[in-house]
């Protein structure tokens, strides 16, 4: 396996992407937040003491995607063109599926920005609800889709 974030001496380095041509890059990442059905109903109905949980989490996810190079040491600062955070609420399972989509015309992919956005949106849901339910879980953080660059399209298969 080739790890391109290390030089021949084993030192961590930022990958040089200056020779690459910018292409449209898209990445979609997700995270799952688990909670009691009662808490999910309160979030859905806007009944949380701290306010609009999903609205605040959406803003946190957008901000996090834009701040990725400040959080992940070897990621490149990118001119992100679009970040969207959306949700699927499953009352039966007591889960919120957070999805973050990032687009940019860049020389490197936006997977880490999408993963960071989904993760921080999920953490914000936890933060705003922890007073009501300490058993909230966050997990299943994963890349769902990416396109752009020479590696082409990646789409996670169901159950993968």
UniProtKB/Swiss-Prot annotation:
Its EC number is 4.6.1.17. This is Cyclic pyranopterin monophosphate synthase. One of its GO terms (biological process) is Mo-molybdopterin cofactor biosynthetic process. Homohexamer; trimer of dimers. GO terms for molecular function: cyclic pyranopterin monophosphate synthase activity. Substrate binds at residues 74-76, 112-113. It is an enzyme of class 4 (lyase). It catalyses: (8S)-3',8-cyclo-7,8-dihydroguanosine 5'-triphosphate = cyclic pyranopterin phosphate + diphosphate. Pathway: Cofactor biosynthesis; molybdopterin biosynthesis. Belongs to the MoaC family. NCBIfam families: moaC, PRK09364.1. The active site is at residue 127. Pfam families: MoaC. Catalyzes the conversion of (8S)-3',8-cyclo-7,8-dihydroguanosine 5'-triphosphate to cyclic pyranopterin monophosphate (cPMP). Gene3D superfamilies: Molybdopterin cofactor biosynthesis C (MoaC) domain (3.30.70.640).
